[in-house]
Amino acid sequence: MALAGSNRSVDGVRNAEREWHDAHYGAHAAYQYPESLDDFLNIFEKGQISRFCDGGWSWWGYARREVIDAIGDVRGLRVLDYGCGYGNLGLYLSCNGAEVSGFDLSQPAIETARKAARRYGLAAEFLEMDAAALSYPDDFFDLVVGFGVLHHVIKYPGADAHLFRVLRSGGRAVFHETLWDNPLINFARRFTSEHSDAGDAHLTEQAIRRFCRRFPQVQLEKRHLFYMLKRLAKLPRMEWQAELEPRPLWQALSSLDQQILRLRPLRYLCGEVIVYLEK
């Protein structure tokens, strides 16, 4: 079956995506996690996650903090780390009292997540799985959380139905995603984004709402206008920023956005969004 809007087959795109991520995660797995759980929590909580995430700049940790703040207290909740990658978000939520499951298309990523869970004595379960063929029971999770994953899965037929199916009635899903509604930000992404042959989607508000159409409650909280200058940190000639940890700069830009984006029409220009869903 051909992928919508493409002459490539769904299986062909899926295999290309798996191969790209297997190579990516396999190359970085050796230095993914520190030895002790305390060290992992310290690194995660400070946002200095260069040892186990792409790029390694402090702004990445700051964005992850936004997800954690958005989902709130997870104690006693059954949580799905959706497209978990190395599993660091799921492990952090497990440390905070959640019953965590995670899945990813990449086998090397899942192996790294499992090893970390065993090392830290956490009960989080990680499985290699396709978002369009989830094996979890119906109405199983209280919360689904994902960071930068919808642009990977939105193109696969059935992924939206499976997301809706595994979330219980009254359950929530929270995703932090990129937006491609601002032409200037999109131009900068040509130079600062990693590109694969897997046909990653350029998410617009319309595309996100279409993917989430089954949910009775959908809220998009658009974020980051000036803060999108963080993209400059991914230019090769500016890798020195990884050593300087310019976290105060990213926080200042975020504070500026909080003031500027009170003008609601400007929110259309934002480069990222937090997606809130409720079933």
Regions found by a protein language model. Name each.
Residues S6, A188, K222-K279:
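A C-terminal cap/extension of S-adenosyl-L-methionine-dependent methyltransferases
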Residues A2-D73, V174-S196:
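Conserved class I S-adenosyl-L-methionine
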